[in-house]
Amino acid sequence: MRKHPILYEISIRPWLYELSKKYSKTISKIKEIPLEEFDILKNIGIDYIWMMGVWKLGKIGLELDQQNDYSKILPDCKKEDIIGSPFAITEYECNPEIGDNNDLLFLKEKLHEKNLKLILDFVPNHSAIDSPFAKSNPEFYIRETNINNLNNSKFYTTTGFYFDKDPYFDPWPDVIQFNYFNENTIEFMKNNLIKILNFCDGVRCDMAHLILNEIFIKTWNKQLENLNCKIPKNEFWEIIKEIKIKYPDKLFLAEVYEDNLSQKLINLGFDYCYNKELLDKLMYGPNEVNEYIHYKNENFFNHVAHFIENHDENRAIFNFNNIDKSNCAGCICATIGGMIFFNHNQFKGFKNKLDVHLRRANDEKENETCVQFYNKLMDIIKDDAFKSHNYYFIYNVNGNDLWKLIA
């Protein structure tokens, strides 16, 4: 058994569109997915499939997206190619476009039959603007209290619900922010998390660091004061340890972009956190990578997920602008210890990014050099030495050239 799993991200609605083309028939529902597709993934060594975007979405987000120009990403983009953000969730029910809740259970069952496990999204920070809970339970959200200030704003809706935001960036205009200094919100989201785990083997938690108390108060201090909210005694993510008492095998993966915050989330119970800093170092060059690895201990690497691309990042070959550099970075991420995180079609060497709001990327041919590289790499990391990760870092202190395992 592998000590650290290999995760493979798939955006489900674009994948269904891709499968429809591959099999020359309409495949739009979970139950219509040819099961041999999962055999392919298992045979190359995948352990977990993160099926991104299964939850019910609102209409407002889609309408906003349809006003955007995607021609730079997809020159021949048509209205039907725009499908809306998978993170503008109205409620944790299966998106009826792809099936129902029973179909999610069917998916988990079929994956288990092939010794695969299923990861689904938990998006804790926000809901879609048109979530039914915005009407039934407005106290769940961060709201503007000055009713005379409800003018057109990039920060909140005309009804005073604040758009979700990262403290360093502009708000996302298709989603509204939950208030984690409200006890009812905390209980509501805990119940949502437990509900999701009935359908899967683990969750990928979107922007998990933003609801840490210290980050939340930094982002929303003024609004929280106006709402007379006090900082909670506990962190929301302490629920992970409670869940693991009953369900010890449930996996928790955090999207987070700073190593110091990753460590806090790991301490709260996350199995793995994004290792975006390693990707940034890989972009700079070997000296930065060597220094980064030198100052991190193996326990840290055992709790992070290494990747060179995902749905947020550009394709690796585009970023590195060189297939050999991209492959080298992929090799490091797959052999350093910790979760190995691959993106759908990464092995094909595509350059064109699949935007999360679209059902397809701009067409291109597979890069045979990349295909052959990943065929070899996936065979290598099936070896027991990489499954156990019972090894130590050996530093090349003299800086001499060393023989390459993969040329």
Language-model regions, residue ranges each:
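Active-site and adjacent substrate-binding regions of carbohydrate-active enzymes
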Residues: M1-A407
